[in-house]
Amino acid sequence: MTQLIKKFSVIIILFLLPFSIYAQTESHQLSTHILDISKGEPAQGVDITLYKLNPSTPSQWKQIATGKTDINGRISNFLPSIEDNTGIYMLKFYTEPYFLKQGLKSIYPFVEVIFRIEGKKHYHIPITMSANGYSTYRGN
C-alpha cells in the first residue's frame, strides 16, 4: 500500500509540475533581455530600472522596479500580472559599466526604451546591442 501511495504521489507531482512552471513564468507582465551582438552572447550583470510615467504630471517618471540581468541576460519578473499595469513605461539599461568591464568604451552610457502597456498581454522588451549601437523590438 505504501509503495502504491508513493507511485501515485510521483505521478501527481509530474502531472502538476508543468502547470506550476507555466504559472511562474506568466505571473509577470513584463520581461526584458540584452543580447551583446558583438559577442553573440547574453549581457549578464546589467542593471536595469523600470519607470512609469505619471499620467497627471507627464514630465515625471516614477521608479517601479530595479533588477540585474541573469546569466542569460534576462530579467523576467517586472510588473506582477495581478495589477492593472496600463500606462507608459521606460526601461533604463545601464550599459556603460558592462562594456567598461570588457575594456570597451561605449557611446551609450545607458539606453532608455519607452513603450506603452495596454491590457493583460505579456510584453517582452529586449535590446540587441554593441558598444556603438542598439536596437529594440517587442518580443514574446
What are these regions (language model features)?
Residues 13-44, 52, 134-140:
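Beta-strand-rich domain onsets/edges
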Residues 44-48, 89:
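Short beta-strand/loop motifs in extracellular/secreted proteins, especially
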Residues 69-80:
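Glycine-centered loop-to-beta-strand initiation motif
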Residues 47-64:
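Short amphipathic beta-strand segments in non-cytosolic proteins
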Residues 38, 54-56, 97:
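Solvent-exposed strand-loop boundary residues in beta-sheet-rich modules
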Residues 81-85:
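Short, surface-exposed loop/turn segments at beta-strand-coil junctions that are enriched for proline
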Residues 1-10:
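Bacterial N-terminal signal peptides that target proteins for export
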Residues 23, 86-140:
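Feature of secretome-associated and extracellular-like proteins
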